[in-house]
C-alpha cells in the first residue's frame, strides 16, 4: 500500500519497479494499491509514466489505483494492507508513516533523514531510488513473520510518540 499524491518526489516508479520484481520472482498473490490524487498537487506526467509502465509490464491485474480516497476508504486500505511502502526522495513529515504504524502494519521506507527521524528503528529502510533494495525488503517482510511482529510492536510504540498530547507537551517546553 502507498497513500499519497502522484508527484515526482514520491518516487512511485521505484515502488512499481520493485513490485514487478516481486511479482516476477515470487508466487505471492499480493496486490499493490497506489491511492492518491493525480490532480491536487499531483503531477499528471508522473501518473501517465506509472500507468505506461504498469501497462507495458502486464501489471494491470496486480496494481490498483483507486485515485483520491476519503478517510473511510483510507482506513479500509490501511486495515487490509500487508505492508505500507513510502519510497519518497523528499518529504516534509510523512503522516502516512504514522498512520501505517498505528494501523499495525509493517512499514518499508526510503532512507531519507525525515523517515529515519520518524521511524527510527520501527521501520525497514531501503536505499532511496533503489528498486532492487526495495524488492529485497519486500521479500524479507514476506518471509520472516518475526520481523513483521517486531516492526508492528515497535511501530505502535513509536507512533504513540506523535500523538496530539505529546505534541502539545513538546510545544509547551519550547515556551
Please provide the spans of the model-predicted regions.
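Carbohydrate transferase catalytic cores enriched for Leloir-type hexosyltransferases
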Residues: 1-175
Amino acid at each position: 500500500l502507498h497513500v499519497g499524491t502522484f508527484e515526482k518526489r514520491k518516487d512511485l516508479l521505484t515502488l512499481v519497479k520493485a513490485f514487478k520484481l516481486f511479482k516476477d520472482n515470487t508466487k505471492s498473490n499480493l496486490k499493490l494499491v497506489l491511492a492518491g490524487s493525480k490532480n491536487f498537487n499531483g503531477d499528471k506526467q508522473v501518473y501517465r509514466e506509472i500507468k505506461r509502465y504498469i501497462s507495458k509490464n502486464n501489471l494491470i491485474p496486480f496494481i490498483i489505483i483507486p485515485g483520491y480516497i476519503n478517510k473511510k476508504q483510507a482506513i479500509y486500505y490501511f486495515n487490509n494492507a500487508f505492508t505500507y511502502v513510502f519510497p519518497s526522495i523528499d518529504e516534509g513529515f510523512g503522516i502516512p508513516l504514522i498512520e501505517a504504524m498505528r494501523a499495525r502494519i509493517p512499514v518499508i521506507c526510503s532512507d531519507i533523514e525525515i523517515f529515519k527521524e520518524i521511524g527510527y528503528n520501527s521501520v525497514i529502510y531501503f536505499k532511496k531510488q533503489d528498486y532492487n533494495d526495495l524488492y529485497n525488503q519486500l521479500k524479507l517482510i514476506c518471509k520472516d513473520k518475526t520481523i513483521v511482529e517486531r516492526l508492528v510492536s515497535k511501530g505502535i510504540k513509536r507512533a504513540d510518540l506523535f500523538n496530539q498530547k505529546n505534541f502539545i507537551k513538546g510545544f509547551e517546553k519550547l515556551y
